[in-house]
């Protein structure tokens, strides 16, 4: 599966 991570 796809994994998305973001920091902001």
From Swiss-Prot:
Keywords annotated in UniProt: Amidation, Neuropeptide, Secreted
Coiled coil stretches, renumbered: none
Parts of the chain that traverse the membrane: none
Gene Ontology biological process terms, A to Z: neuropeptide signaling pathway
Keyword Secreted on entry: yes
Location of Glycine amide modifications: 8
Main localization (coarse): secreted
Localisation per UniProt entry: Secreted
One GO cellular component term: extracellular region
RNA-binding listed as a keyword: no
Family of the protein in this entry: Belongs to the kinin family.
Biological function: Mediates visceral muscle contractile activity (myotropic activity).
Name of the featured protein: Kinin-4
Organism (species): Periplaneta americana
């Amino acid at each position: 599966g796809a994994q998305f991570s973001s920091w902001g």
